[in-house]
């Protein structure tokens, strides 16, 4: 068995990072494996800040830490009053993922802003949804084919992040 002891870092809340880079916001995420995988996805795509609602699972849950595969050392998590934080962002794109959103492949995406990902079962909360100014949807393929109702949260986050970064590479 291995035991590690370290000081839990505290990162100061700074909305300026959202105006200068792409960040994630997680609204009431419950599954520690999903959180860990999302942290790993963020690290892969160079996203350094994740803002979490107070009700999001603890980042130091053993399953979360294991799923990050070390990415937790490079990605900064901020637990906050998520609706208040988002409301404080001025002139910054706030993207959210919704089953009734617009096809993300047809929308203009920016290299900075906040991408909100919602709870595994309930999606983005109504309070946070009211603050989103760009509602996105990941379309299934082919469009008329009957498929699963939705994607796993971590998988959806990976697809969204990949599309944002793909667009940046083509700028």
Residue ranges and their predicted role:
Residues 10-101:
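RNA substrate-binding interface of SAM-dependent RNA methyltransferases
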Residues 1, 21, 112:
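Conserved catalytic motifs of the protein kinase core domain
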Residues 13-21, 91, 106-108, 142-144, ...:
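Short, glycine- and charge-enriched coil/turn segments that flank and shape catalytic ligand pockets
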Residues 44-45, 59-73, 126-171:
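Structured adenosyl-cofactor binding patch, chiefly the S-adenosyl-L-methionine
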Residues 4:
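Glycine-rich phosphate-binding loops that contact phosphosugars or nucleotide phosphates
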Residues 95-148:
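Active-site/ligand-binding-proximal alpha/beta "capping" segment
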């Amino acid at each position: 068995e291995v035991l590690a002891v370290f000081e839990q870092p505290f990162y100061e809340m700074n909305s300026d990072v959202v105006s200068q880079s792409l960040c994630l916001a997680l609204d009431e995420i419950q599954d520690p494996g999903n959180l860990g995988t999302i942290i790993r996805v963020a690290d892969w795509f160079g996203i350094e800040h994740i803002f979490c609602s107070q009700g999001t699972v603890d980042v130091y849950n053993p399953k979360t830490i294991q799923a990050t595969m070390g990415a937790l050392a490079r990605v900064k998590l901020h637990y906050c009053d998520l609706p208040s934080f988002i409301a404080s962002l001025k002139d910054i794109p706030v993207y959210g993922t919704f089953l009734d959103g617009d096809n993300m492949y047809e929308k203009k995406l920016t290299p900075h802003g906040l991408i909100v990902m919602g709870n595994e079962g309930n999606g983005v909360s109504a309070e946070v949804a009211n603050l989103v100014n760009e509602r996105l949807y990941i379309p299934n393929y082919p469009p008329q084919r009957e498929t699963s109702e939705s994607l796993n949260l971590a998988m959806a986050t990976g697809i969204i992040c990949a599309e944002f970064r793909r667009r940046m590479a083509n700028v």
